[in-house]
Amino acid sequence: HDLHGVTLAVIADADGGLTVFGLNLGRDTLASAKARFGDTLQPALVARLGEVGALEALMEPFSAGFVSGRLVLSFDVSATSLQRWRERAGKSEAMEGGVRRFDMTHEDRAEADGARIAGLSFVPGLKLSEADVRQRFGEPAETLTQADGVRVLLYPAIGMTAAVPASGKTRTALQYVAPRDFNARLRAPLVAAAAAASAASASASATN
């Protein structure tokens, strides 16, 4: 598989920032993304039951060079703002995975335009193996295994993780944040999840 078009779109700068697909993570806003991608970008407030939720923007199909797939932008928004937007939402609709999508008011959508892009995920339409990822991006700094067998390859220099499913039923997901935020936003949650998976596995072995 050729991921050449994807890697060409990633530029890390000296101060720990990152530009992916023309968007500077941590600096550009939802308004910047709308200006770049137009009406095909779909912003939404999404949340699971009992959660405050998150502001996301989806674009599918999204073309990254020669590879197309699904692009999801995530944003830095305070819990207070998210709670207020959710309470004022007129209605919501159910999505897959127990997630609900909330209709934001016109005023809240205007406020959301100023939210800074914290990171993004790109799921290529083609299936990628761990070997494909290594061939394109080189040896990862670290590899972690999650409870569901997903292997996550970590590339802190370009603020990227590649989550490769064990079964091949789902597609490989590439996640990007600014390299300066890599440990806090991506690595720390992954390490915690991998440790929990390892502990659960050890416990299961001990009881068998």
Please place each PLM-identified region on the residue numbering.
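A cross-family detector of function-defining hotspots
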Residues: 30-208
